[in-house]
Amino acid sequence: MKVGWPGESCWQVGLAVEDSPALGAPRVGALPDVVPEGTLLNMVLRRMHRPRSCSYQLLLEHQRPSCIQGLRWTPLTNSEESLDFSESLEQASTERVLRAGRQLHRHLLATCPNLIRDRKYHLRLYRQCCSGRELVDGILALGLGVHSRSQVVGICQVLLDEGALCHVKHDWAFQDRDAQFYRFPGPEPEPVRTHEMEEELAEAVALLSQRGPDALLTVALRKPPGQRTDEELDLIFEELLHIKAVAHLSNSVKRELAAVLLFEPHSKAGTVLFSQGDKGTSWYIIWKGSVNVVTHGKGLVTTLHEGDDFGQLALVNDAPRAATIILREDNCHFLRVDKQDFNRIIKDVEAKTMRLEEHGKVVLVLERASQGAGPSRPPTPGRNRYTVMSGTPEKILELLLEAMGPDSSAHDPTETFLSDFLLTHRVFMPSAQLCAALLHHFHVEPAGGSEQERSTYVCNKRQQILRLVSQWVALYGSMLHTDPVATSFLQKLSDLVGRDTRLSNLLREQWPERRRCHRLENGCGNASPQMKARNLPVWLPNQDEPLPGSSCAIQVGDKVPYDICRPDHSVLTLQLPVTASVREVMAALAQEDGWTKGQVLVKVNSAGDAIGLQPDARGVATSLGLNERLFVVNPQEVHELIPHPDQLGPTVGSAEGLDLVSAKDLAGQLTDHDWSLFNSIHQVELIHYVLGPQHLRDVTTANLERFMRRFNELQYWVATELCLCPVPGPRAQLLRKFIKLAAHLKEQKNLNSFFAVMFGLSNSAISRLAHTWERLPHKVRKLYSALERLLDPSWNHRVYRLALAKLSPPVIPFMPLLLKDMTFIHEGNHTLVENLINFEKMRMMARAARMLHHCRSHNPVPLSPLRSRVSHLHEDSQVARISTCSEQSLSTRSPASTWAYVQQLKVIDNQRELSRLSRELEP
């Protein structure tokens, strides 16, 4: 590679050959002295990623070369360009806040002329200021999407942090009090009110509202631990839930940490936090920024980033620091736990922990719940408030049965324990083991006590088993049809219950009430099937009578089409079980004429990349990516495969057809289709998907995979249509429609498709179309900027999470982030801890999976005029969503054709092809 500005001498840059005589001995860490400042090579050397293990050869024309020893692939930020760029970003952010503060000041003067005036307090006069409480009242009176005092306090804290608001005594924390006075710096602005100014004010308040929660969290962390309020402790605790350094800790420990964490900022890169050999006094978590880890002899070992931690080992082992920590960039923020607090928390955890042993081995570990950590109800008299941390599967089940009472409600902690167990039991207790254990408990009778006591014990125990089984059936529903062990167990249990009149009558009385009080959704998102009580209970619904809304759900026993291509692009379609293995697919192919043995099954994407499939791989038809196809070929032909023409995507766009349908109606059609896919996902599919098929072989995640494929399809659909629109004017109109489409999807609470469309608009092939973006009206560009805020990934997508928390169901969440959270929980926590099941991990996975149940707890109202609404209306009209297909948004394209179009989108997913088309549009 040759490097140089036009007119400069060219430098040839490449890996050095160690045995080359032209190089001589490499000079480790040396830089060539002959490289002038300002040349392109000088800039390359500043920004170039240089691994320690390689030397680089720099050949200047007619001059002797030199060698450079690299440090690591991560670029260091001590170059002037990087510092200038970072400072410019911070300066731009500050300018936006200052401008927002001036706009807010101007509007407050116009609406509340007496807000800012001279104040007298404790014999002191404060000129031209307002009290904290009055300022909060004034901003609340503006409306503009601000609904709570805490939200306004966050806005004011942002203004205070950036200097757009000042405390008369220079306090750094905003307080909503009458005796705290604040003033806006600078001259008093002219009170001008225009329609455009009101729009800018709304945009300013939205910006401040977005940054408000982060400012409040920083204030809470800056406070001394003893001065933090309960609300601030909850805020810190919520933040700790998304920090990977503490993901392995229990929630009770995280609450303890929230009370002792200290905020420690450092402003300058190169600051040494501590040195190797120092005494360990603190444990650090990186909240913002990054650090370099350096040791004697090895130099730079690694770089740690946001969410990583360091320093814990020295506290645990009471040993000196094993490395030196150096700030890698400016403005690094750390969360610090001092040694005495660290040791106290460890001791408190041990004091709250109870271990049960059998035959000299620990079989159950319980932790006493902290006061206020549980639901807001008084503890039940005589019942200890312990949480299962780990245990053997049998002991966890035994404790669950003992904890279940006949009078527990849906808000009882036992109900959550039951839900956690049922959602995750396949991870640690397969159905065969669970059924055997339940039958064992059903037959167990106590050895001592009177006959009446024994009879009461047996009756209560069997009631608990029936209740657990009924909830198990309610959760999994028809998924148990394909499990022979489960069906056999349910039949045996039905026979046993039929012999006991008390249990049969109790089952008939309790089941309808249980169904009304506690609805555990099945795979279709509707009410769970109830048992039909005749002479014997029928546990499972009749397969001949499918449940409402289940037509699109793929079950384990279903057969799906396997479209298999030959190298000549001829296609054979087989109907095979969705969980069929590659070996079974090849066996079915062997029975077809013209197919020979010795061939392999591979999947090929639109770029022509082929990946061989292992014989034991299952569900390959439903796990195919976007525009991927299955090919059966001889092994030597794999590298010669050419994608099927259908994989390459369209060559002509649909801009003319899309012009006939409004963005509102298009969003409604997309949302209706997404709901049909989203409702087909069972909660447990998230857990199965994260664990992988190698752990659970007799389950399918086809519904979840189909929904994820739809997400990818939508984002590439946006990029495809824009790249296939050759005329600048219509292309700008199409871009405008997609931005409005994203806004309507957000309004309809379809956040998954909203993110997909926004990701499509941010595709590099689209974002580079500068002339197209310039054609957009200013109002549309402002709308796009406002929508982009929800995509902010900082602090683990805090903006999105806060927005989601404010939405009431029905909601379609951003599924990739939910799966990321599930993967984070799975990979950050061991399933086994000291040979016991880590039930704390199961609890966290179940909590994440229940997000689907929460989002679908109210039925959506169809938004498309094509689909019937009568059968979908919810009983509670207050939660029904209003149709967006108003008279003002009627489209000239028929709803039927639009519905067919959104279900069969054709896209180009080859990024190289999209980039090529983009360059043709705007070179």
UniProtKB/Swiss-Prot annotation:
UniProt GO molecular function: cAMP binding; guanyl-nucleotide exchange factor activity; protein domain specific binding
Main subcellular location: membrane
Outcome when changing residue 321 to K: Reduces activation of RAP1A
Superkingdom of the organism of origin: Eukaryota
Every DEP domain range: 110-186
Residue ranges of every copy of the Ras-GEF domain listed in the record: 662-889
Gene3D superfamilies linked to this entry: 1.10.8.1240, Jelly Rolls, Phosphatidylinositol 3-kinase Catalytic Subunit, Chain A, domain 1, Ras guanine-nucleotide exchange factors catalytic domain, Son of sevenless (SoS) protein Chain: S domain 1, Winged helix-like DNA-binding domain superfamily/Winged helix DNA-binding domain
Annotated N-terminal Ras-GEF domain residues: 384-518
The entry's keywords: Angiogenesis, cAMP, cAMP-binding, Guanine-nucleotide releasing factor, Membrane, Nucleotide-binding, Phosphoprotein
Ligand binding (3',5'-cyclic AMP): 311-314, 321-322
Residues the record lists as Phosphoserine modifications: 79, 528, 864
Keyword Nucleotide-binding among record annotations: yes
Region ranges (Interaction with PDE3B): 218-242, 398-422
SUPFAM superfamilies (alphabetical): cAMP-binding domain-like, Ras GEF, Ubiquitin-like, Winged helix' DNA-binding domain
Effect of residue 315 to W: Abolishes activation of RAP1A
Tissue specificity: Widely expressed with highest levels in adult kidney, heart, thyroid and brain, and fetal kidney.
Compartment(s) of residence: Endomembrane system
Gene Ontology CC: one annotated term: filopodium
Primary role: Guanine nucleotide exchange factor (GEF) for RAP1A and RAP2A small GTPases that is activated by binding cAMP. Through simultaneous binding of PDE3B to RAPGEF3 and PIK3R6 is assembled in a signaling complex in which it activates the PI3K gamma complex and which is involved in angiogenesis. Plays a role in the modulation of the cAMP-induced dynamic control of endothelial barrier function through a pathway that is independent on Rho-mediated signaling. Required for the actin rearrangement at cell-cell junctions, such as stress fibers and junctional actin.
This protein's name: Rap guanine nucleotide exchange factor 3
Organism: Homo sapiens
Higher taxonomy: Eukaryota, Metazoa, Chordata, Craniata, Vertebrata
Gene name in the database record: RAPGEF3
